[in-house]
Amino acid sequence: MPEETQTQDQPMEEEEVETFAFQAEIAQLMSLIINTFYSNKEIFLRELISNSSDALDKIRYESLTDPSKLDSGKELHINLIPNKQDRTLTIVDTGIGMTKADLINNLGTIAKSGTKAFMEALQAGADISMIGQFGVGFYSAYLVAEKVTVITKHNDDEQYAWESSAGGSFTVRTDTGEPMGRGTKVIPHLKEDQTEYLEERRIKEIVKKHSQFIGYPITLFVEKERDKEVSDDEAEEKEDKEEEKEKEEKESEDKPEIEDVGSDEEEEEKKDGDKKKKKKIKEKYIDQEELNKTKPIWTRNPDDITNEEYGEFYKSLTNDWEDHLAVKHFSVEGQLEFRALLFVPRRAPFDLFENRKKKNNIKLYVRRVFIMDNCEELIPEYLNFIRGVVDSEDLPLNISREMLQQSKILKVIRKNLVKKCLELFTELAEDKENYKKFYEQFSKNIKLGIHEDSQNRKKLSELLRYYTSASGDEMVSLKDYCTRMKENQKHIYYITGETKDQVANSAFVERLRKHGLEVIYMIEPIDEYCVQQLKEFEGKTLVSVTKEGLELPEDEEEKKKQEEKKTKFENLCKIMKDILEKKVEKVVVSNRLVTSPCCIVTSTYGWTANMERIMKAQALRDNSTMGYMAAKKHLEINPDHSIIETLRQKAEADKNDKSVKDLVILLYETALLSSGFSLEDPQTHANRIYRMIKLGLGIDEDDPTADDTSAAVTEEMPPLEGDDDTSRMEEVD
């Protein structure tokens, strides 16, 4: 890529133009924008104004620590200049500007992470107005423009011009036009059918709708005509100079002629008699009007603000095309003063938990002056979906990021913001329909909060909602669960897994369901982390039904029966443990099974099968942790099941019976699968099952006409020992 820059003493006659190709994804995006019909093209202006606002934020932030940065232009503003003759709508800001490298990288050669994501969203039917959320808002100019010119001046570089008609390439050259001082001028050359965006009324309408809460003055420059009375001589002179004057006016748009209309009227009254000598002529002038005079919404009294105003502010703040779901507007006074306006969006952003993403979306102001928009210390990461503004009276204006990390004031603000967010969620929870929408989008954040925020864990746990064995298609809170607990029930029972159906049909919940004990279904991977920290709720312990030592409410008679069963099957447990050796830590009689013959449970402090699955899926997992945290497996057998009873009888008749060993291994492997674990050697297990199928179909292993492949399978299997006359179904290795 050519990167030749001209030295300042080089003659400027031969202007050097460099051509660059757009990065493939950006070229694709532009082609999509240009060749697809979108009805709401007006959002291009919102995006360009929003970019100007960001550029102004940057220079203002830099000037807090180095005031000389503003020597190239003290005023921070945005100007909109429509030109009907040239069909251009120029957006000028006095922001930070771009260096040549910025221009090449930001506008064409380096794709943002959102470029591809936005194209995918568009093709899936998303609204074009989402473009700003993906960081590629500039390209929306091509919704209305056939060509876009960008002229920019950064304090550290010369003035450059970028230009593209979107044909897969763009040009960059040193700009020899009118010096800018500092900032950026974006000039969309509008298509013939898009001239409505040059109309004063239309521009005002768009700015009011999308950008009225931008923190810098947006001024519209419009060329207008007015009548002026002059004497005949003056009129002739005026006509002679008309062309010259038009030229001058175009050049000096920021220096408008100010006409004292009042004095005209007085003159008219005084010189009524001289009217015959006067002549009316049309005079052109540039009218300037500030379009966003509204004072910051967060400084107003919440009682005076309508929901529509909050909605408009939210949209201008976030570039979201939908309304917010909930809002919290409050001020804190006393030793510390600040105001905050917080919004919950309707949807989680596409990159909510991406590491590269900025950690929050709260803009920090100090006494109405914008300081920064991703101050990590302002709100914890689990609340990174909250959008809004915080305006402090106490922080110094020239505060740096380093100082913010140490700031006690900020710690107090953060604590208050978290408290108010939780209040907002609790209020939202009273409206079931809206809370359902909120929970679908942000349940992971609540659970992450339980994992990370020990101080607010209790409050956050009240916001959790889960499906249970008794709740049907509705999610319920832990509080609801507690109100339905049986009289003699001491614990809250839960099971973790992949899907609702999987956990509902699990062997682990059989006895609990039979006894009418409600079980909570935790089916998101983050639930495993959440429940590690959430040990109890309202004094009741949370107990996993997949771990050892499950205590169920029992009367004395049931306890006595259970003890008898333990004694009766003690010998079988010992034989099974000897057969399985190190595969399991112990074999015990179960109190949780009803219809399944056996299941694998894990030790109290180890991982569950579900957690082991999650950890195995981590690309950067630590294998040493896997070693000691991986589930210590316990095999539990169901003493009331016919398979286990028959196995006990066979084992007692002959403990060296080979078929007992085969069946124990098959039972263990099947229990592993049904309990949510994966097999270390699935092929051997599959071969055992195929052998069983053949026996069930009456296929003779010794038959020479048997299929070659089955012979191959048989060769791999160790020969069965024991009496050939025993049932062939039992001879399974």
Swiss-Prot record:
GO terms under biological process: cellular response to heat; protein folding; protein stabilization; response to antibiotic; response to cold; response to heat
Keyword annotations of the record: Acetylation, ATP-binding, Cell membrane, Chaperone, Cytoplasm, Membrane, Nucleotide-binding, Nucleus, Phosphoprotein, S-nitrosylation, Stress response, Ubl conjugation
PTM sites of type Phosphotyrosine: 314, 493
Positions where Phosphothreonine occurs in the chain: 5, 7
Residue numbers bearing the S-nitrosocysteine modification: 599
SMART domains reported in the protein's UniProt record: HATPase_c
Start-end of Acidic residues biased regions: 230-246, 256-269
PROSITE patterns in the record: HSP90
Principal location: nucleus
SUPFAM superfamilies given in the database record: ATPase domain of HSP90 chaperone/DNA topoisomerase II/histidine kinase, HSP90 C-terminal domain, Ribosomal protein S5 domain 2-like
Start and end residues of each stretch annotated as Interaction with NR1D1: 629-732
Chain segments carrying region Interaction with FLCN and FNIP1: 285-733
Disordered: annotated span: 225-279, 701-733
Domain notes: The TPR repeat-binding motif mediates interaction with TPR repeat-containing proteins like the co-chaperone STUB1.
Complex formation: Homodimer. Identified in NR3C1/GCR steroid receptor-chaperone complexes formed at least by NR3C1, HSP90AA1 and a variety of proteins containing TPR repeats such as FKBP4, FKBP5, PPID, PPP5C or STIP1. Forms a complex containing HSP90AA1, TSC1 and TSC2; TSC1 is required to recruit TCS2 to the complex. The closed form interacts (via the middle domain and TPR repeat-binding motif) with co-chaperone TSC1 (via C-terminus). Interacts with TOM34. Interacts with TERT; the interaction, together with PTGES3, is required for correct assembly and stabilization of the TERT holoenzyme complex.
HAMAP family: HSP90
PANTHER family: HEAT SHOCK PROTEIN 90 FAMILY MEMBER
Function per UniProt: Molecular chaperone that promotes the maturation, structural maintenance and proper regulation of specific target proteins involved for instance in cell cycle control and signal transduction. Undergoes a functional cycle that is linked to its ATPase activity which is essential for its chaperone activity. This cycle probably induces conformational changes in the client proteins, thereby causing their activation. Interacts dynamically with various co-chaperones that modulate its substrate recognition, ATPase cycle and chaperone function.
Official protein name in the record: Heat shock protein HSP 90-alpha
